[in-house]
């Protein structure tokens, strides 16, 4: 979940900052992909993990927005990423850690994916993975998608991007910093 809070003054670290507004919405790169597809008149199914009360809130919000989803419920609580915006437009972000997965959680995700692995379907793997998520599992996701004749789009960075490139995705969407990191260069201001 993404929480945006607005304050009327510059953020004062170590002091009470009262928000004048607060907004909660489903968040994460994958959810944003589904929202964009919906806004363009298409349909998608958001897959991934959900946890606890926050997970139920997210699923209810997605259902209300007519965004289809099929999440694997896991132990713990879905993380909330908080953004504080001050009157001058300054942004401060605080991102909670995600939940660790056990092997059975990952296997349940693979089983859930089986329902959607029809040739020609498009899968977007975007964002970060849960803490301590093995690269071999990310590779397995990529290979499973490609093996079934589905299109694979990657929006990742670092080791995840490197691992995904080995699976020959159909499209990769790195930003300038992710691309520079992938090729061992520094982004230029040009």
Predicted regions and their residues:
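Conserved phosphate-binding/catalytic loop of the ribokinase/pfkB sugar-kinase fold
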Residues: 84-119
